[in-house]
């Protein structure tokens, strides 16, 4: 791009955005003219490629981290039969047509189902950086297409995954030359409800009890229709903003109706955690459920909830349940939004600064 040191104003030849090569003796060659009506004068501070290059280098650092830990990078399909069953998520669908044959496919909301098939086949340490898609999501923190990092360890518990994440955040912060989290904090859901809501939360806590708590705390729950809604509305208003943003916070031991693809511990809590930093929810981790019958029942319950909410009906991926039935070893895994982590590291407020 034409450098600031080159006095070209008033020239009939050069305009903002032209690309030139500076030669010896002050000569220059016009390499690529700007043929648009847009002025696109860039400095080192606002050069779009420099910012984009930093984003791609960041992804390379993530890959370097996992390769140093002897993880294998894998790839799952982009067109899938089941995009994921989480009730709150809307999906993108498409159709394969070959003559009279038609077959419906979806863009994945997560690569989780297919990654677990690899675990059932014998994979022990795997990761993927995948594009995922969630229809109807567009805010400063949400995008209908974003990038998910998922990694899994066979024969590992959640504490190992938690340690991985702490090391990853610190490794990337050092590579980007930004501040690490000031401190790592861990709370259970029950501890947080006791501390900030003066409420004894148990795995048996009912929807009516949460509704009464919301009314007591003056939390607006008019939009709530399920026990999950009451839980999250209270959590987001009274708990989520309580810890300092410069701390990396892990929240663990969730109620059983939010176990999702996690197993329950001996006390009846969902054995999973969520991670927060710099005001952002970054990741969800699970001590993975590997019982095919319980998993099928939970997945079908999710689909029933989707139907009740008026969302698009989808089917289950039978090959996933076949893989579980053949035997998936005890495993733990995590899904981390890498745009979110980059936003937390670089103090970026809008995901469009990365995605655009």
Go through the PLM ranges and name each one.
Residues 58-62, 165-168, 210, 235, ...:
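Generic structural signal for hydrophobic residues
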Residues 2-160, 170, 218:
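Class II aminoacyl-tRNA synthetase-like tRNA-binding/catalytic domains
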Residues 75-78, 176-186:
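Short, glycine/acidic-rich hinge or "gate" loops at secondary-structure transitions
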Residues 77-82, 89-118, 125-154, 199-356:
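A translation/RNA-centric and nucleic-acid-associated enzymatic feature enriched
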Residues 8, 151-177, 313-325:
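Well-ordered alpha/beta subsegment
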Residues 71-72, 178, 198-199, 219:
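Short aromatic/hydrophobic-glycine micro-motifs
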Residues 180-200, 329:
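Short, conserved secondary-structure transition motifs
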């Amino acid at each position: 791009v034409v450098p600031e040191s080159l006095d070209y104003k008033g020239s009939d030849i050069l305009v903002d955005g032209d690309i030139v090569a500076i030669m010896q003796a002050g000569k220059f060659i016009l390499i690529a003219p700007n043929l648009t009506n847009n002025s696109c004068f860039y400095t080192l501070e606002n050069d779009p490629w420099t910012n984009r290059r930093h984003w791609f280098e960041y992804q390379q650092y993530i890959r370097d981290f996992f390769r140093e830990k002897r993880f294998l990078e894998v790839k799952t399909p982009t067109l899938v039969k089941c995009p994921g069953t989480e009730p709150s998520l809307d999906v993108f669908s498409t159709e394969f047509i070959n003559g009279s044959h038609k077959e419906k496919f979806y863009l994945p909301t997560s690569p989780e189902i297919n990654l677990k098939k690899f675990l059932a086949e014998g994979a022990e340490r795997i990761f993927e950086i995948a594009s995922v898609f969630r229809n109807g999501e567009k805010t400063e923190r949400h995008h209908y297409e974003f990038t998910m990092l998922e990694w899994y360890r066979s024969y590992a518990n959640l504490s190992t995954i938690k340690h991985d994440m702490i090391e990853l955040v610190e490794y990337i912060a050092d590579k980007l030359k930004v501040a690490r989290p000031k401190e790592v904090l861990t709370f259970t859901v029950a501890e947080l409800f006791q501390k900030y809501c003066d409420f004894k939360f148990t795995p048996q806590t009912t929807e009516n009890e949460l509704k009464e708590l919301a009314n007591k705390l003056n939390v607006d729950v008019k939009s709530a229709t399920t026990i999950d809604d009451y839980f999250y509305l209270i959590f987001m208003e009274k708990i989520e903003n309580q810890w300092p943003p410069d701390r990396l916070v892990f929240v663990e031991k969730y109620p059983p109706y939010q176990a999702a693809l996690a197993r329950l511990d001996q006390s009846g809590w969902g054995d999973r955690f969520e991670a927060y930093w710099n005001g952002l929810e970054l990741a969800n981790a699970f001590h993975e459920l590997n019982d095919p019958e319980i998993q099928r029942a939970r997945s079908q319950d999710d689909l029933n909830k989707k139907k009740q909410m008026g969302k698009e009906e989808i089917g289950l991926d039978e090959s996933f349940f076949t893989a579980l039935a053949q035997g998936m070893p005890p495993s733990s895994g995590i899904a981390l939004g890498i745009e979110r982590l980059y936003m937390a590291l670089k103090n970026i407020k809008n995901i469009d600064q990365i995605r655009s």
